[in-house]
Amino acid sequence: MRRRLAIAFSAAAALAAAAPLVSGPSSQVAWTLETVKLARSGNAARGKKLHQDCAQCHGEAGNVDIPDVPDLGGQNSLYIYKQLSDYKAGSRTSSIMNDAVQTLSDHDMADLAAFYSAQKPPRSTGKPALPNDAAVKLATVGDGVRLIPACDACHGDRGAGNPSFYGMSVLKDRKSQDLTVQLMAFRSGERANDVYRVMRDLCKHLTDSEIAALASYYSETPPEKLPAPSSASK
């Protein structure tokens, strides 16, 4: 574990040092103590009422059987709050979400985040994937040569979450296609709301096959054909 973290943080530090000086946080959310307190103050009951306007796409409890719609049940509340805030500010783009969140207040977003994080996480519907050496290495050790830290060092073991990092997403059992689309969007720069460009700088080193393998590894489903990049902003 210590070796994994050492590799992860060494690579992350190198990435930060290599990034242009003007590449500050790409998100409108600054994790001050006040922001964290607000994001964690959400009321799930109020969030459930607000969710009624979201249920057509995201299902009754935040999970829906549509490949490119993300599952929200059991997701980190701070991550959800950040994404909603970024959609509203325009630092994350989506033809649907940018309009959908414009009437939400900061407290509304905290309430929705509390509701979704309190729901049951999605369950994998496919057969478990066979272990993939490339995915396991990237997830647990990383690749120091390419300055790629272990994914699990930030996202938790098997992507189950890491409360030590504010706003860190849960990857475990999320849809393979959605994970693939998001990694591809970070790689191309189409998605640019990662703080200090960390995900973009990591993903630019990943091959198509590595992205597919990581998506399969965390979703615990067999690899699927890579989706078209044009769906990445959903």
Question: Where are the predicted features?
Answer:
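The canonical Cys-X-X-Cys-His
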Residues: 47, 54-61, 112, 148-157, ...
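C-terminal capping alpha-helices of c-type cytochrome domains
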Residues: 22, 102-125, 177, 201-233
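Inter-heme linker and motif-flanking segments adjacent to c-type heme-binding CXXCH motifs
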Residues: 63-64, 90, 118-133, 138-145, ...
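Electrostatic cytochrome c docking/interface patches
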Residues: 22-51, 65-66, 118-147, 230, ...
